[in-house]
Amino acid sequence: MIEQAGKIALFHTGQTGIGAGMRGGGGVRLKYSNPMAVDDVAADFPDLDIILAHPSFPWQEEALAVATHKPNVYIDLSGWSPKYFPDILIRYVNTLLRDKMLFGSDFPLLTPDRWLADFERLAIRDEVRPLVLKENAARLFKLGAAT
């Protein structure tokens, strides 16, 4: 249905603060947030654009693999301060996935101002910054020319 409607699917991936430290994790089962589960969806629905929400900790490399392998999978960088991004994620932002990484803050848990200030300190190539911060999302959401 989502694919037929031309909409975008977003899946939360990786550890969440919801339920963290609570008895039984508040019932949240982290295994369902492994981005490898989305690989099946991306293969079965190749015309469905999919966003993996968050850097997918502790499965960041799996998320990078899925987004690299499946042309319809993107990663939003919300939910974690960029100062905690591992080197491999920064490498992929600058190279293989430069056109598939999306800005996100996860407000109100992380304010856009804080996320942007931390992102500014990363070793992100100058030509890649506008892709992550605006142009990739504008293209994905078909918002016209990213000006």
Predicted regions located by residue number:
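Short, flexible micro-motifs
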Residues: 82, 107-108
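Catalytic pocket-lining loop regions of alpha/beta-barrel enzymes
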Residues: 1-102
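Conserved, mostly hydrophobic/aromatic
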Residues: 2, 54, 75, 106, ...
